[in-house]
């Protein structure tokens, strides 16, 4: 998801939703990424401090920053979302291990979060089946 640490709006609640999902789906193959849309202010140190507010496990939840032009390209080409400084979506997206976008859902609507969790579980189950098949060859 795209966010910024000083957001006066929904970003904290969106990241809280991700924290809740990570607690519920306790699978090491499920990794969440929160990508800032304010890289000038959201330095790695600032993001580390922000992540601490959620007791984020850095192995399972990445808070990322970078060059704004690259972040914009990732938003439009990968997430299919427009991204500008201070402008972001309230959506969480699911990608499989092949990097394919499988779906995105609004993080502040309970019914949508439930669908997001189902999709995550479905994708993890697909990966488990694939991993199991690979192990037997």
Residue ranges of predicted features:
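Structural microenvironment flanking redox-active thiols in thiol-disulfide oxidoreductases
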Residues: 13-74
């Amino acid at each position: 998801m795209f966010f910024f640490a000083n957001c006066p709006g929904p970003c904290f609640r969106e990241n809280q939703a991700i924290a809740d999902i990570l607690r519920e789906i306790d699978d090491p193959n499920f990794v969440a990424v929160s990508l800032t849309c304010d890289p000038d202010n959201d330095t790695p140190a600032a993001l580390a401090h922000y992540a601490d507010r959620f007791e984020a496990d850095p192995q399972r939840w990445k808070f990322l920053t970078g060059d704004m032009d690259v972040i914009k390209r990732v938003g439009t080409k990968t997430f299919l979302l427009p991204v500008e400084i201070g402008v972001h979506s309230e959506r969480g997206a699911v990608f499989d291990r092949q990097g394919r976008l499988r779906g995105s859902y609004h993080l502040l609507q309970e019914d949508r979060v439930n669908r997001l969790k189902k999709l995550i579980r479905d994708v993890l189950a697909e990966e488990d089946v694939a991993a199991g098949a690979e192990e037997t060859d």
